[in-house]
């Protein structure tokens, strides 16, 4: 029998953002009605919807509000009212903001000054050791799929006392990749068991593919082509490792990859392969078990804020029969004459 392996990618465009409300922070001021605490509100992006109608896990408003990390904020104060944007951390230095009861809170509270403005940068989820260089932070993609984070970023410029609440519109900074898997084998005599799925930079898995780390500019707008720079290192990912009997119905997995945007198209220098290990069990009169590995090259540019699905179909080439019958051969001496009987 010959093995067959098919792969398809469904690209999904990011949707518009959905809002989440919050009340103004309760002021812990010095009883001066002239001082107003700087409070925060956030709008959270949601995952894309596939063109075929399937849906990935959604980063909802509740998810961010219930998270222990919340989001981190950098804020830079300028004493004049000029509209010049100056990013930094002289007012907020990686301040953690979390949701409690009905509001986004932080401690210690800081207050608006009568004059000047503040330029804000934000990211989520918050990480204690995140350092700001100008308007940029470094980000490392976790090597274990289950530990990867859906990085968000936002900015809000030229904010003054009259604004009261600083509202962030967060965008997805990474590309999200999911997969479905099924078999085209129909019948009761053969079982296909999935053992492993790997994404690598070569068909043999020896070359690494995905960026390990990069630098994101929090001051950039959504879809900016120069959002990411300073890529370092490469790594592969083991997407699945276990046993899963396949059927003709596609099964999706919740272990999404969150990766730095990267170009694996034909014109790019980077390569990406999906490698699948599986077991074939024959339950006919002559029972047999064998393992197999197949691979396929993925030529796709994975873009920021977009979700993708790799559709895998694992199967066998069925044994088929055909029949033909040769024509009767008429020999030259095929005629047998019998003398007549008198």
Language model features with spans:
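Sec-type signal peptide cleavage vicinity
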Residues: 2-342
């Amino acid at each position: 029998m010959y093995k067959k392996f098919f792969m398809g990618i469904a690209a999904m465009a990011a949707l518009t953002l959905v809002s989440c409300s919050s009340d103004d922070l309760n002021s812990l001021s010095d009883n001066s009605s002239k001082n107003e605490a700087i409070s925060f509100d956030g709008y959270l992006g949601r995952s894309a919807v596939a063109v075929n109608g399937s849906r990935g896990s959604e980063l909802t408003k509740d998810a961010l509000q219930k998270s222990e990390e919340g989001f981190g904020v950098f804020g830079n104060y300028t004493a004049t009212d000029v509209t010049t944007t100056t990013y930094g951390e002289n007012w907020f230095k990686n301040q953690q903001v979390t949701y409690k009861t009905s509001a986004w809170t932080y401690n210690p509270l800081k207050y608006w000054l009568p004059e000047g403005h503040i330029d804000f940068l934000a990211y989520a989820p918050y990480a204690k050791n995140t350092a700001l260089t100008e308007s940029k932070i470094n980000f490392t993609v976790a090597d274990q799929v289950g530990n990867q984070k859906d990085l968000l970023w936002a900015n809000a410029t030229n904010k003054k006392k009259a604004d009261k609440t600083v509202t962030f519109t967060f965008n997805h900074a990474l590309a999200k990749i999911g997969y479905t898997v099924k078999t085209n084998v129909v019948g009761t005599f053969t079982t296909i068991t999935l053992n492993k799925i790997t994404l690598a930079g070569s068909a043999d898995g020896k070359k690494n593919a995905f960026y390990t780390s990069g630098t994101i500019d929090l001051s950039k707008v959504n879809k900016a082509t120069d959002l990411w720079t300073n890529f370092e290192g490469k790594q592969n990912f083991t997407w699945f490792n276990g046993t899963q009997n396949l059927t003709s119905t596609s099964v999706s997995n919740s272990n999404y990859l969150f990766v730095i945007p990267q170009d694996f198209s034909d014109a790019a220098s980077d390569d990406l392969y999906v490698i699948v290990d599986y077991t074939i069990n024959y339950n006919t009169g002559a029972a047999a078990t064998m393992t197999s590995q197949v691979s396929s090259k993925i030529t796709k540019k994975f873009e920021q804020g977009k979700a993708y699905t790799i559709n895998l179909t694992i199967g066998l080439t069925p044994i088929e029969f055909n029949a033909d019958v040769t024509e009767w051969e008429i020999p030259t001496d095929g005629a047998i004459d019998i003398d007549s009987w008198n």
